[in-house]
């Protein structure tokens, strides 16, 4: 059986500030508590033989991966298709501003200067399919809240990518077998399809 362990990056400085970051060139480090939580997750996963660790282009995901894997020799690869949503002109704004923009717009509306939630959803579905096409038995995926939320909700058969799972905690593992991740990719794609 193949296993995919999806986890959101550990607590970052922008999590503390309640601000959003959708640009991987903006450095956002982990907090001390975030590094400790990632190290704890690494300890919790130590009995698993990880074959691969995937992270996004965002430094906070790589830093989380390195803390989790400390002392282990596991291949690290970057998967840009799992990058956080490009929020364009909302970069650095508050979570409240981001949520207000979302409430006032459709999923198909791109953020000013960025991408739409549907665009990101289709990108995440492609990323999960790429992971499924690989041969590793146990893969750790360190990414962001939105792709994990979408995967959980789509795999559960929800008609919304944003519910019932809504907030994904940092540095918490979510386990998917091959069939469940494939169902998630199919569901995300179906719910992100252009109208």
Model regions and ranges:
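Active-site-proximal alpha-helix that buttresses catalytic centers in soluble enzyme cores
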Residues: 2-3, 7-72, 115
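Generic beta-sheet signal
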Residues: 4, 137-145
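Acidic, His/Gly-rich catalytic cores of divalent-metal-dependent hydrolytic chemistry
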Residues: 187-195
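Short beta-strand scaffold positions
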Residues: 55-56, 122, 142-143
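Glycine-rich phosphate-binding loop signature in dinucleotide/nucleotide-binding domains
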Residues: 46-49, 131-138
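Phosphate-handling substructures
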Residues: 14, 28-29, 70-126, 165, ...
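Short active-site segment of divalent metal-dependent hydrolases/proteases
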Residues: 12, 147-148
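Domain-level recognition of soluble alpha/beta enzyme cores
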Residues: 158-187
